[in-house]
Amino acid sequence: KTLNVGISTRVFDRFSVELEFYNRQTDDMLMGYPLSYTTGHGSSVENVASMRNRGFDITLGVDILKTRDFSWSVSGNLNYNKNEITKLFNGLDEYTLPDTGLKMKVGKPWGEYYYVRWAGVDPRDGYNTWYDKNGNLTKSYSEEDAVFVGKQRYAPWSGGFGTQFGWKGISVSADFSFMLGQYMLNNERFFTENPTFAGSDNQTVEMLTMWQKPGDVTRIATPDSPMQFDTHLLENASFMRMKNLTVGYTLPPKVIQKTGVISNARIYFVGRNLLTVTKYKGYDPEVDSNI
């Protein structure tokens, strides 16, 4: 079930705008859910779930300058999407996905993290501290204290923009993409900033700040307080990336035609993913991987 309302226009043969609002209800979505082991199977995949997506798309384009020898244009698009789980399976309102840090709950967006909240390292003894479900500090880690933390795996905002420039035979184009509001668990830090693995894995320079004596203010706890998969590993993975950069030169037709063999020729350079701006410390904010 989909409702779309949009408008598309071009003004002065130079400005173009497309705007669309949508409301999509998707039913009978494929979903894997657990079965009793007495059935002989651990899980089944069936058409049982429902989800609603609401948002808008906007696309803009501007021909800034256009003459016989010179042209310059810019374009961009922006999407906002808010999803909501409206139905699970067997009448359940919530279901935790094992070992993922994610929980599905009717009325919540798909992809909101469900973790125990890390509260820092106690400078008195170097032990990790967490918040329990009631917001009280504790040094005892329990997955029963996991809550929705208001951070999503999937970015609600995404888009891109680009520019094209041409002067005589020279052409330059650049395309960028971005995502805003997405978070990722930096699994690498569990190994590279963890005293437990200091003897077997490469460690980051952050390990030089590990707690050693009372009064030390740090986020690397003593080896006596094991690290856990909690919110301190969640990082803002919003990013802007230059996806493509193309620089080219089209040889003058008069020069090419003198060869008597070819009618046109173009020399160009293409670069991909040349620049990424992000606060995420992992390998790639677009790839959820432990590599």
Give the residues covered by each predicted segment.
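Solvent-exposed loop/turn elements at secondary-structure boundaries
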Residues: K1, E20-M51
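Short sequence motifs at beta-strands and strand-loop junctions characteristic
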Residues: K1, V48-R54, K108-W110, K151-P156, ...
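Membrane-embedded beta-strands that build the outer-membrane beta-barrel scaffold
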Residues: L3-T9, F15-N23, F56-I64, W72-Y80, ...
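Short loop/turn motifs that connect adjacent beta-strands in outer-membrane beta-barrel proteins
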Residues: R14, L65-W72, I85-N90, P253-I267
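Outer-membrane beta-barrel and related beta-rich outer-membrane complex signature
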Residues: M29-Y33, Y37, Y80-P98, G181-T209, ...
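Flexible, solvent-exposed coil segments and beta strand-coil junctions
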Residues: Y33-S43, N136-D145, V217-T231, V287-I291
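Conserved small-residue
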Residues: E46, D63-R153, R272, K279
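Extracytoplasmic gating/loop element in the C-terminal half of outer-membrane beta-barrel translocons
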Residues: M179-R272
